[in-house]
Structure formats: C-alpha cells, structure tokens
Design a protein with these regions (language model features):
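Hydrophobic residues in well-ordered beta-strands that form the structural core
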Residues: 54, 94, 119-120, 260
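N-terminal Rossmann-like dinucleotide-binding module
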Residues: 1-48
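Rossmann-fold dehydrogenase core element
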Residues: 105-124, 143-148
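Beta-loop-alpha module in the N-terminal Rossmann-like domain of NAD(P)-dependent dehydrogenases
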Residues: 52-110
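Predominantly a Rossmann-like dinucleotide-binding segment in NAD(P)-dependent oxidoreductases
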Residues: 124-215, 343
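C-terminal glycine/acidic-rich active-site capping loop/insertion
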Residues: 204, 208-209, 214-215, 223, ...
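C-terminal helix-rich "cap/oligomerization" subdomain common to oxidoreductases
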Residues: 3, 23, 59, 68-71, ...
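A short helix->loop->beta-strand "cap" motif at the edges of active sites that frequently abuts
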Residues: 50-51, 88-90, 114-117, 232-233
C-alpha cells in the first residue's frame, strides 16, 4: 500500500488535531508543515517529529510534493491556499469555513474539478451518535419528519483575536459554529430551499485570556430558519455568548424523535424516542415515555475525518462530505447574512446529494 505524504498549512493549535489523527493511520506520513512565522513551524515540527518546516508554502509544495495538504490557516486565506495546493497536485482538506465568501467557495469547488483533486471541507458529522441516529431516521421509528432544530453555541473563541476581526475571519459565530449546526441538518434533510435569518453582535467588548481587551467586528448571535423539501421547517442557532457549550440536534417525526447530543450537558449521546423496540437500553428521558439508549456504532481512527479523507484519496473518490455539500453550506451562510441585512428570505440554488440511504417516505 502506497504511503500517503501529508503537509500542513498552518501551525496553530488546530493543526495538532489533524497531525495526531494522521499519526494513528497506517502508511501515512506527516512530511512537512508551514507557518508564516518560521519559529512556529519549527516548534510544531519538533513536537511531532515532522522532517521539514517552512515559512514559504509554495516552496514546501514544490520541494516535498505532498499527496495531500491540511489547510488550517486564517479563514480569509483558505481559498487562496487551497487552490494553490490543488494546482500543485495535492488533495486538500480545509478547516471550516470553506471560505469567507460564496464567490471564493465556488472558485475552490471549480478548482477541485479543474485539477481533479479532492476538496474535503469541514464540518465532519460522521461520529457514532450521528451515524447510529441515521439508522433510526425511518418512518418505522419516528414517522414522517415534521421539523428539526440544531445548535452549537458557546462563550466564544478564547484564543487568536483574529477570530473577532471581520477582515480576517470574514464573519463571526455564523461561519465559526453555525456551519456545524447547519451541516447536521442538511445531512439529514438534504439541500435547503430557502433561508431566513437574524444576526447581530451582543457583546461589543471582550476580554481574552491574558487580559487583552478587544472590540469585535463580527456577529456573535445568530438564529436561522430553513425550508426544506416537502415543506419541512428547521431552525438553527449559532452564538458566541452562551455561558457553556450547547451542541445538539433534534429531529422530530410525526410519532417519535431523535436527540443527538455532542456536548457534555447530557449523559446520553443519542436518545431514540419511539414506540418501536430499539436495540439498546430503555431509559427515562425528559419525562418522555418510550425512550431508548441505542448501541452506538464503533469508531476507529479510520472512521475519523482524516481516515475518511485518506480512504477517499486511496480509492480515488469523493469523501463522505464532498465539496458540493461544503459549497451548499457556504451559500446558505452567505445568504443568511443577506437575509439578516435585508429582512427577506433567500433562495438557495446549489445542489448536493445526501450520502446515506435515506427513505423517500421519511420527508
């Protein structure tokens, strides 16, 4: 089996996650890392035994010829860096958001087609509670889907004050965490038809760790309303002003519901509310009858985002979450900002197909 060589654009703390995931995979080598500040690249290379480090990413691409590049640079650089990497012959996995505007996102999508390279964007929902939930999103268990709600809210990024700078980040909580809430909804319900949104900033001054004071120029409070195929409505919330992390999705059916919990507020990662028997343990939940704690799918390093990305490279196919779905997320968030500014709902035009075997009768 051919060894896949991986390079990293960005040496901040987010890169650690991907480096560690890659170390757990067979026949994968972390070959090089780039940072604008050479000392950051050197320190990260020493920490993880990465042989080469650079402060010129084009030189890194030319000299090390990686099979794939992980892009974790500031948001406003995602498009340029990703396109340059694909042009140089590398597949790309890019942190969220895909880009800071819809035009750049479309150019990234077109570049992946032009250069015939995989463009894998985040978010990544393929965790045990989500993949297990899909097995029960069937008419047999919950009836026809009637609505849904998804949320990712927390106090706000404690690091890197550029997150609060619109010129660099492109947007605030909408782009940073709204993409997660949206991704889970569209993975279940398919493409959004229309979006309406409210977006503002509630906290005009912030105190970062170390005592640094900043004045954000981005949104920290967002509520979105979506219309999906079949007339199903869903809502999403994305904020940076909650006192704690709230990260969950609920799918409501005519005769049941699915509670998917990604935070630590609930002892149960997944609860199925249904009158049908579920493989698992019957529990009491929210004072509802007929609730089940199902057995979750197993999760290995190969099931995580790096594992799926490497699998797609080896098999020359698109990953579970392909560029089309990432582009759709970018269009929805872009037009959510437009809706919040104009007070009018916005039509969504980008298509994609859900990656799981969804029943036609469910929606």
């Amino acid at each position: 089996m051919k060894k896949i060589k991986i390079a990293y654009l960005g040496a901040g703390e987010i890169s650690d996650r991907f480096i560690i995931m890659a170390q757990k995979l067979k026949n994968v080598e972390n070959i090089a890392i780039y940072s604008k500040h050479i000392e950051n690249a050197r320190n990260k290379a020493l920490k993880y035994n990465i042989p080469f480090y650079y402060n010129n990413y084009k030189k890194m691409l030319k000299e090390t010829k990686p099979d794939a590049v992980i892009v974790t640079t500031p948001h406003s650089l995602h498009a340029k860096h990703s396109i340059d990497c694909m042009k140089a012959g590398a597949h790309v996995l890019v942190e969220k958001p895909l880009a800071t505007n819809f035009k750049d996102a479309k150019n990234m999508y077109l570049a992946s087609k032009k250069y015939k390279k995989i463009l894998n964007g985040l978010p990544f929902d393929h965790y045990p509670q989500f993949t297990t939930a899909l097995k029960y999103i069937k008419e047999k268990y919950i009836g026809k889907i009637t609505s849904a709600h998804s949320e990712l809210s927390f106090p706000g990024p404690p690091r890197l004050n550029w997150y609060y700078d619109k010129k660099i980040a492109g947007g605030g909580a909408m782009l940073d965490v709204g993409c997660y809430a949206l991704s889970r909804l569209i993975s279940v319900l398919g493409p959004v038809k229309y979006v309406s949104a409210f977006s503002n900033m509630l906290i005009p001054k912030r105190l970062l760790p170390g005592g640094k004071k900043i004045k954000p120029t981005v949104d920290d409070n967002n509520v979105l309303l979506f219309e999906f195929e079949g007339g199903v409505f869903a809502t999403a919330k994305a904020s940076w002003q909650h006192p704690f992390l709230e990260n969950r999705t609920v799918i409501y059916g005519r005769c049941g519901a699915i509670f998917i919990n990604f935070d630590n507020l609930d002892e149960y990662p997944l609860v199925i509310h249904t009158k049908k028997k579920v493989q698992g343990k019957k529990i009491k939940y929210r004072n509802l009858p007929d609730c089940w704690l199902p057995e979750l799918d197993k999760f290995t390093p190969e099931d995580d985002i790096m594992g799926k990305f490497i699998y797609a490279i080896r098999n020359n196919n698109q990953p579970v979450y392909d560029a089309g779905q990432s582009l759709h997320i970018m269009e929805v968030m872009h037009k959510a900002y437009v809706s919040a500014k104009t007070g009018k709902k916005q039509k969504i035009t980008t298509p994609f197909r859900v990656w799981w075997n969804k029943e036609k009768e469910i929606q």
